[in-house]
Amino acid sequence: MEGITGKELILAASAIGAGLAMIAGLGPGIGQGIAAGKGAEAVGRQPEAQGDILRTMLLGQAVAETTGIYSLVIALILLFANPLIRLL
């Protein structure tokens, strides 16, 4: 029986790392849901400030989404363009 080669170990670790990176997408999703709920509450309390509330909420959600996008990019790099495999 043969042992695990270096390439197989890197591929397995990359798959685990990609999965962990995608778990990082949960945080922004939960945060954006809370922000949208609070924005809806704020508009309900002050309908005349709807434009300001919407603008601030969308800016905050865009900033929060960058974390999810970065984790997706890292996962895609680990799965499809892994630079560590070339080192073997």
Curated annotation (Swiss-Prot):
InterPro entries: ATP_synth_csu_bac/chlpt (IPR005953), ATP_synth_F0_csu (IPR000454), ATP_synth_F0_csu_DDCD_BS (IPR020537), ATPase_proteolipid_c-like_dom (IPR002379), F/V-ATP_Csub_sf (IPR035921). GO terms for molecular function: lipid binding; proton-transporting ATP synthase activity, rotational mechanism. GO terms for cellular component: plasma membrane; proton-transporting ATP synthase complex; proton-transporting two-sector ATPase complex, proton-transporting domain. CDD domains: ATP-synt_Fo_c_NaATPase. The keyword Ion transport applies. The record marks 65 as: Reversibly protonated during proton transport. Keywords: ATP synthesis, Cell membrane, CF(0), Hydrogen ion transport, Ion transport, Lipid-binding, Membrane, Transmembrane, Transmembrane helix, Transport. It comes from the Bacteria. The chain crosses the membrane at residues 10-30, 68-88. It is a multi-pass membrane protein. It is found in: Cell membrane. Belongs to the ATPase C chain family. F-type ATPases have 2 components, F(1) - the catalytic core - and F(0) - the membrane proton channel. F(1) has five subunits: alpha(3), beta(3), gamma(1), delta(1), epsilon(1). F(0) has three main subunits: a(1), b(2) and c(10-14). The alpha and beta chains form an alternating ring which encloses part of the gamma chain. F(1) is attached to F(0) by a central stalk formed by the gamma and epsilon chains, while a peripheral stalk is formed by the delta and b chains. F(1)F(0) ATP synthase produces ATP from ADP in the presence of a proton or sodium gradient. F-type ATPases consist of two structural domains, F(1) containing the extramembraneous catalytic core and F(0) containing the membrane proton channel, linked together by a central stalk and a peripheral stalk. During catalysis, ATP synthesis in the catalytic domain of F(1) is coupled via a rotary mechanism of the central stalk subunits to proton translocation. HAMAP family: ATP_synth_c_bact. PANTHER family: ATP SYNTHASE LIPID-BINDING PROTEIN, MITOCHONDRIAL, ATPASE PROTEIN 9. This is ATP synthase subunit c. The gene is atpE.
